[in-house]
Amino acid sequence: KKGVTQREDDRTFPCNSGRCACQPLDSYSYTCQSPSSSTANCKNNVCVSEADW
């Protein structure tokens, strides 16, 4: 599992195009998932798309 450093979080979208970045409630690093996946485990119930990053 590849982690994303905090330094990169501010600048570079951490996921592949077409996917979204979910910040798990118990973690500071983002995980990437399909936009159609549930966001129940994501902070603020949000999975951030590349356009919204």
Swiss-Prot record:
Query: Which residues are trimmed away as propeptide when the chain matures?
Result: 1-6
Q: Which domain of life is it from?
A: Eukaryota
Keyword Disulfide bond on this protein?
Answer: yes
Q: Does the keyword Transport apply?
A: no
TM region(s), chain numbering = none
Which cysteines are disulphide-bonded?
Answer: 15-32, 20-42, 22-47
Q: Which residues form a coiled coil?
A: none
Q: Which GO terms describe its cellular component?
A: extracellular region
Q: Provide the domain comment.
A: The cysteine framework is IX (C-C-C-C-C-C).
Report the protein name in the record: Conotoxin Cal9.2e
Q: Which organism is it from?
A: Californiconus californicus
